[in-house]
Amino acid sequence: MNNSKTNQQMNTSMGYPLTVYDECNKFQLIVPTLDANIMLWCIGQLSLLNDSNGCKHLFWQPNDKSNVRILLNNYDYGHLFKYLQCQRKCSVYIGEGTLKKYNLTISTSFDNFLDLTPSEEKESLCREDAHEDPVSPKAGSEEEISPNSTSNVVVSRECLDNFMKQLLKLEESLNKLELEQKVTNKEPNHRISGTIDIPEDRSELVNFFTELKTVKQLEDVFQRYHDYERLSQECDSKTEIASDHSKKETKIEVEPPNERSLQITMDQRDNSLYFQLFNNTNSVLAGNCKLKFTDAGDKPTTQIIDMGPHEIGIKEYKEYRYFPYALDLEAGSTIEIENQYGEVIFLGKYGSSPMINLRPPSRLSAESLQASQEPFYSFQIDTLPELDDSSIISTSISLSYDGDDNEKALTWEEL
């Protein structure tokens, strides 16, 4: 083990071993440093490889692989240098004819190197044994390679696709260049001449066409006319689109009333009147509002209830209980909710169903509705006095008859 490590250190200090193949020879090189220019110079020093930097491509592979990669730029050389630094044996092949001779496949830098099959390994060993005897330069020069010697080189599918993409781009560029040359070099086969008599009273036309002296000026007029036609068509199309949008907007249905309503469910039991309020609007119902309930009997009674400082959020419930209340509920009773400014912001009537939808009255101004729906931010919980479990939030309500001065005090509590 110590001897092998010592040999590796000696090889690294002396250089990096590299096997070089051409169509007739095999050479063992020691590259002193990992530099592309120095490696090319070392390969070019061989008498039979003096054209390796010129007309022939260089390919490389780790030993015992069946495909090779081309050496074109620093990126490709960098991959080769990583293998050499790891003390892996690598080979360099010169020219496509050498690849055909050794039956090697060209791959891109994104493909993996493929291992040799057992049959290919035997053939590789036989070829290496055959190359142990040096071949004279004359023998190599006598073998001429036909122009189609690289026609049977195997190329990977990905590499072939890249070649096809480059060929398509080249074809498009050539077609575009040819079309531009035809347009610039096009000459009219014949000239059209003629005269148009313009009446003298059309002074604007006379002055306009008098200024046209060259064919270029006439082409400019023609081009401007076509630009005007194109812009006119675009404006017409935009006008049609705008009209279509306006038609669609007229067909938009108005939101159903239930989307802007307060839902109140009423229930009467145990000499008490229960109100369950659900905020089904799109805004928060502010605090400090009042609920007015008016009977529909012969002698209507109006109850004014302070709803307290708490706001009611969107899609939130709140329940109230008012007692004592011994009257019977009749259809036609009115429920109103007033804001802190005394304006009615929601209105509805009690019918056969216990659920009532309160909606904003049509006479209510937008400013009043907005002011009533502003959230009550000045209220703070920490300002309330501490209460025990038996405490009840209550206030007084007035019960009055129309035309009668008698009043009866009621109380309410909030659950």
Curated annotation (Swiss-Prot):
Pfam families named in the record: ATG19
Region (ATG8-binding): 406-415
Region described as Disordered: spans on this chain: 126-150
Gene3D superfamilies associated with the record: 2.60.40.2830
Gene Ontology terms: biological process: autophagy; protein transport
Modified residues (Phosphoserine): S136, S141, S243
Subcellular localization, as worded in the UniProt entry: Preautophagosomal structure membrane
Post-translational modification comment from the UniProt entry: Polyubiquitinated at Lys-213 and Lys-216. Deubiquitination by UBP3 is required for full activity of ATG19.
Assigned GO CC terms: phagophore assembly site membrane
Composition bias type Basic and acidic residues, residue spans: 126-135
Motif WXXL: where in chain: 412-415
CDD domains per the UniProt record, alphabetical: ABD
Region spans: AMS1-binding: 254-367
UniProt main location, coarse: membrane
Function: Cargo-receptor protein involved in the cytoplasm to vacuole transport (Cvt) and in autophagy. Recognizes cargo proteins, such as APE4, LAP3, LAP4 and AMS1 and delivers them to the pre-autophagosomal structure for eventual engulfment by the autophagosome and targeting to the vacuole. Involved in the organization of the preautophagosomal structure (PAS). ATG19 association with cargo protein is required to localize ATG11 to the PAS.
Complex formation: Interacts with the vacuolar aminopeptidase 1 (LAP4) precursor and mature forms. Also interacts with AMS1, APE4, ATG8 ATG11, and UBP3.
Notes concerning its domains: The coiled coil domain is required for the interaction with LAP4.
Protein name (record): Autophagy-related protein 19
Native source species: Saccharomyces cerevisiae (strain YJM789) (Baker's yeast)
